[in-house]
Amino acid sequence: MKFAVIVFPGSNCDVDMFHAIKDELGEDVDYVWHDAENLDEYDAILLPGGFSYGDYLRCGAISRFANAMKAVQKAAEQGKPILGVCNGFQILVESGLLPGVLIRNQNLKFMCRTVPLRVENNETMFTSQYNKGEIIHIPIAHGEGNYYCDEATLKKLEQKNQIVFRYVDNPNGSVSDIAGIVNEKGNVLGMMPHPERAVNEILGGAEGLKVFQSILKYWRETYVVNA
């Protein structure tokens, strides 16, 4: 399996994401600059955290216009796994690939610590290696991670089982304790916590690795077994 880590000006978690795939998952991965126009050779696309374009205007607001995002849109339409973490999540909502918006944390402060999450849906290509209701501990590092959507959108997310992760002890004010959601098709996941920072016990925990193992499992079952 081959992953792409999209690198925007200001990305700073791309190395962590690359390490998670290459050294912990053991799969092929490339850094792909934001002006790339073709991602056809990749089986999964990863949008890392950071401060793309300095977070000017709004977090992710400028990145949505990058050439690579047109290719990400195409990959999403093809059903390929797309994972956006932190700033990557912000880019996904700005691009319209996921509903809602990320706003300033309720306390208006940057937060950087490990928090408990509850797995709400383990039937996605990103969470099949978890148990439903499982409590996992994943680092957060954000100033604008407060997920917001209107009541109609929230109702739709709940009805269609698109809420994948919830905070056990909401750190930022996110509506309905939301930490991560998928699109209706189930192949685009956005989450504020950083699973790539929890892939080895030496880092303090490895509970984030299952996100990437789930993607690999999906790909093998879909494209290798059926080949």
Curated annotation (Swiss-Prot):
Tell me the Gene Ontology biological-process terms attached to this UniProt entry: 'de novo' IMP biosynthetic process
Q: Where in the cell is it found?
A: Cytoplasm
Major localization listed first in the record, in broad terms: cytoplasm
Per the record, what are the reactions this protein catalyses?
N(2)-formyl-N(1)-(5-phospho-beta-D-ribosyl)glycinamide + L-glutamine + ATP + H2O = 2-formamido-N(1)-(5-O-phospho-beta-D-ribosyl)acetamidine + L-glutamate + ADP + phosphate + H(+); L-glutamine + H2O = L-glutamate + NH4(+)
Q: What are the record's GO terms for cellular component?
A: cytoplasm
Entry-linked HAMAP family: PurQ (MF_00421)
This chain's protein is named Phosphoribosylformylglycinamidine synthase subunit PurQ
Q: Which organism is it from?
A: Bacillus cytotoxicus (strain DSM 22905 / CIP 110041 / 391-98 / NVH 391-98)
Question: What gene is behind this protein?
Answer: purQ
